[in-house]
Amino acid sequence: MAQVCSISVNHRHAGIEGIERARFRDPDVAMLRLLSLPGVSEAVVLQTCNRVEIYAVAESVEDIVGFARAEGMPLEIAEVRAGDDCLKGLLRLACGLESMIVGEDQILGQLKTALLQARRLGTIGPVLSTAIQKSIHVGARARIETEINKGSVSIGSAAVELAESLLGDLRGRTILVVGAGEMGTLVANAMAEKSLRAIYVANRTFEQAEKLASSLQGVAIRLERLCDYMGSADVVICATGAPHLIITKKMVEQCKGEKPLIFIDITNPRNIEETVGEVPGVTLHNIDSLRQINEASMRRRQGEARKVEAIIEEELVLLQRDIRRLHADRVIGDLYQRTDHIRATELRRAVARLSTAGSLTEQQISILHDFSMALTNKILAAPTRQLRRAAERCDEDCLRTAEELFDLWVEESNGIPGNKTKASKTD
């Protein structure tokens, strides 16, 4: 029977190189390819700077593992989950407990984006839609009822905290932020509170850089003029969504001034060439360097995390119930479809046989139709009640037995239950 399962390569077991290896060049293509596999009925891909995750509804976890292996995901550092373990992991993720920066809020927006994209592509169905929507609800509830997101709760704010720990004090410093999107904005806003000497904002779209810089009393610069400002900066934080290098070793060698320069790259894929750290007087940090910030964050939030865990346990029971109901609804739907196909076929035969003895009136045919519908519904009423009760008490065996007893298989040519191919695409 189909179940929810996931494969995740994330910061807990992989460094930035491992996460880069796991990334899909085109997540949309990956979702469509995954959905095309036999036994897979739903698929969602979630990619952030700290994780690459596949969520699917599949007959077997091995279906997803085989897909991930073929796509080149490093399974030796991946987490594979199925069933309730997968559902609980999704709730923990939305609550920020699985994040590098515990309690960070950005994951909720990332989950919403993944959900909407899967809907647009048509790769998601009722099970994953229910699970992800529930996770977003639980994540919001956790942040309202606890202080899990109090303090530095984003990669951006953690990068600022890292810069502060490296320099001791940011007052009077000059900061260059590369990127004016969501993450760049978080960094720039956090930096603006530190009594800086100057803050520069560079972005591919200059108008966006101007908008952000003006809100902070900073200076917007064009991306091609990075070198003109890099030499005067104390810290350069790269926070773009670009899939390629923006700052190279050669560029830094040409642009660096006399004073030490710190680079912090919080992107994935990385935007700063790894060899930049070899330039004399230059220090390069990436997402892996933020682990120390996360450890401190986790220590501060241990009490709040326990409160969140209690919320998760409570909501997990409700999610499990909802998923079971979906399974029961699918079995009941298949049962009614199978029965209605038989009813309609036999009704046509009865009308044809009666017509040989003389023409039937429209009223007589209507009476026969109503009779067949009433008979079918009354016969199925008790099995329907029992199947719903089975779902409530977690009796998967009962649901599976019903599928076998009523021969609930889908005919490939017309989608009518009663032939050879199992109805996994609606699970």
UniProtKB/Swiss-Prot annotation:
The active site is at C49. Signal peptide: none annotated. It is an enzyme of class 1 (oxidoreductase). InterPro entries: 4pyrrol_synth_GluRdtase (IPR000343), 4pyrrol_synth_GluRdtase_dimer (IPR015896), 4pyrrol_synth_GluRdtase_N (IPR015895), GluRdtase_dimer_dom_sf (IPR036453), GluRdtase_N_sf (IPR036343), NAD(P)-bd_dom_sf (IPR036291), Shikm_DH/Glu-tRNA_Rdtase (IPR006151). It catalyses: (S)-4-amino-5-oxopentanoate + tRNA(Glu) + NADP(+) = L-glutamyl-tRNA(Glu) + NADPH + H(+). The keyword Oxidoreductase applies. NADP(+) binds at G179, A180, G181, E182, M183, G184. CDD domains: NAD_bind_Glutamyl_tRNA_reduct. Keywords: NADP, Oxidoreductase, Porphyrin biosynthesis. One of its GO terms (molecular function) is NADP binding. GO terms for biological process: protoporphyrinogen IX biosynthetic process from glutamate. Pathway: Porphyrin-containing compound metabolism; protoporphyrin-IX biosynthesis; 5-aminolevulinate from L-glutamyl-tRNA(Glu): step 1/2. Its EC number is 1.2.1.70. Disulfide bonds: none annotated. Substrate binds at T48, C49, N50, R51, S99, E104, D105, Q106, Q110. During catalysis, the active site Cys acts as a nucleophile attacking the alpha-carbonyl group of tRNA-bound glutamate with the formation of a thioester intermediate between enzyme and glutamate, and the concomitant release of tRNA(Glu). The thioester intermediate is finally reduced by direct hydride transfer from NADPH, to form the product GSA. Catalyzes the NADPH-dependent reduction of glutamyl-tRNA(Glu) to glutamate 1-semialdehyde (GSA). Belongs to the glutamyl-tRNA reductase family. Possesses an unusual extended V-shaped dimeric structure with each monomer consisting of three distinct domains arranged along a curved 'spinal' alpha-helix. The N-terminal catalytic domain specifically recognizes the glutamate moiety of the substrate. The second domain is the NADPH-binding domain, and the third C-terminal domain is responsible for dimerization. Homodimer. This is Glutamyl-tRNA reductase. It comes from Methanocella arvoryzae (strain DSM 22066 / NBRC 105507 / MRE50). The lineage of its organism: Archaea, Methanobacteriati, Methanobacteriota, Stenosarchaea group, Methanomicrobia. The gene is hemA.
